Curated annotation (Swiss-Prot):
One of its GO terms (biological process) is phosphatidylinositol dephosphorylation. It comes from the Eukaryota. It comes from Arabidopsis thaliana. GO terms for molecular function: inositol-polyphosphate 5-phosphatase activity. This is Type I inositol polyphosphate 5-phosphatase 10. Residues 183-209 are annotated as: Disordered. The keyword Ligase does not apply. Its EC number is 3.1.3.-.
Amino acid sequence: MSDPLYIFNRSQSEIVVESLLASSNLRSSMPTQQIQSLRVFVATWNVGGKSPHSGLNLDALLHVHSEFDVYVLGFQEIVPLNAGNVLVLGDNEPAAKWLAMINQSLNKSSSSSGGRLSPKTPSFGAGSMFFAKPSLKKISESFRTECRRKLKICNCSTFSEDIVRKYGRESCFRCPEGLVNQSGVLSDDEEDEDDDDDDEDEDEGGGKVASLVSNQMTMKYGLVASKQMVGIFLTVWMRKELIQHVSHLRISSVTRGIMGCLGNKGCIAVSLQLYKTSFCFICSHLASGEREGDERRRNLDVIEILKNTSFPRICRTSFTRVPDRITKHDRVIWLGDLNYRIALSYSETKTLLDKNAWDTLLNKDQLKIERDAGRVFKGWHEGKIFFAPTYKYSYNSDAYAGDTSKEKKNKRRTPAWCDRILWHGDGIRQLSYVRGESRFSDHRPVCSVFVVDVEVCEGKTGTRRQ
């Protein structure tokens, strides 16, 4: 008679073997990982509290003919930093205008669009939305309507039995109630937390806003995220076909203004996952001042931003790594008016500027000094600077403030590279680091182009960019 224990062990072994074979077959049919390269355009611009006017054209700033995969655009001082905007209700009309102008540049009709017309954008003439007080919420929704339908909160896969049975179908779980619908995508009634004050009845500009996107299917770029905190404004755009591969989109902000708690200084951070790679984009405006020791206040701002920026977990799968801190992301780009100055007097700086003595000036750059000493941005990277200091210019002029006899001495500021772009993590290669020459503000915009490696699943749709 057979040994019952032997029969039991034999049965268990068969089960184990069958399970291993099934697991092996599953792994062999799973998509393999591959690396694709995407081109990311990043720009930062302190616009000096000025709202965009009808004559401002962003085409040159955004290098629209180069057709990047991702645009990360950060602004500072989009509103005047007065008590009304800082202490009371913020003004989001300028942010709405900036969004409209960005969309106008990115989605205008071009020969590369195959002859299709891009969505209508505001004509900044009489009767346009520039005179109808545009709503940031309405414009954001217009630019996100089609893209939001595709934007998944969570697209993580799991090896649980129900997923094994359904393998081959796209995995996308429901996340926190109220954020997503049954299909796991952003619901159309989601409210932007910074737009709660925009629920007023539709004004005469409503029709203009509605007409901004007459045919969403023809949009080349879609708005992925935008957030305003007083004068800081961060917006992220992507090629439309990429947006369906975005998940875990989260936004965080840290205030570092007066007494460390007002939003006139601080940062906005956007976290997202593109395919299988996590990204974090930070737009900041740090403490101002060119007195000795002010650089330590800026260092503290950076330290507190890194410490206090956190992102909520919105992934249903418990084993999935969803980064909750800035430096835990695979690819991180930090942009903004960092406000670091040159540790020289005005006259010494001007003398070196006149001689184009960039290396000597850069050796006195506070950010370089603080980084080299390991006091701030340890482990971060910045490209070589080959452009003139970006601050402070006289308005509508190529002269630095204080250069002309008409300007009072108290308006003089030592020229400095206040506006910077840094990055953290592997798989990021900088192709260019330049400044723009718009005279719109007392700052010059700064732009950078990166080639970023993204881990994708073979078989997923996406375009390789070199």
